[in-house]
Amino acid sequence: MSGWDDYIKLLFGKSPAIKRAAIIGSDGSVWARSGDANAFRATEVELKRFAALFNDINSVPGTGADLEEIHYIVPRVEEKLIFGKKEQTGFFAAKTNQAIVIAMYEGDNAQSASVRAGVEYIAQYLASSGY
C-alpha cells in the first residue's frame, strides 16, 4: 500500500457499519483519518488520552473511554484491543507496537463482529510490516 490513507480506505471496505476511522501513533498523533462526510472528529487531547489507555488496559472497563466528545462504556478489553459501546454506536481499537487502529461504527452487535475483524486485520498487517 502506498500511504496511510489507503489503510483507512481498506478498513472501510471491511464493514459497511464503519462510519469513521483513524490510525494514530502510540503517542496519540494522527497518522491518517477519514474525512469529508465521514470525518473522524476526535481531538488531539482525546487521542493522547485514548492512546494512554493501552498502558493500563485492564482498568479501562471501570472508567470507559472518550472519543469524539462521547463517553463509551467498555464492556470488553483484550491484550491489545478495546471495545467501546454506547447505544447503537461503538468503536474497536487495536494496538500494534507503534500504532492504534480505530474504527467507529453504527449498528447492532452482529455488525460489530465485522468491524472488529476489519480493525484486527489492519492492525495485524501493520504489525507484520514493523509498525
UniProtKB/Swiss-Prot annotation:
CDD domains: PROF (cd00148). It comes from Caenorhabditis elegans. One of its GO terms (biological process) is muscle thin filament assembly. It is found in: Cytoplasm, Cytoskeleton. GO terms for molecular function: actin monomer binding. The keyword Cytoplasm applies. It holds the Pfam family Profilin. The keyword rRNA processing does not apply. Belongs to the profilin family. This is Profilin-2. The gene is pfn-2.
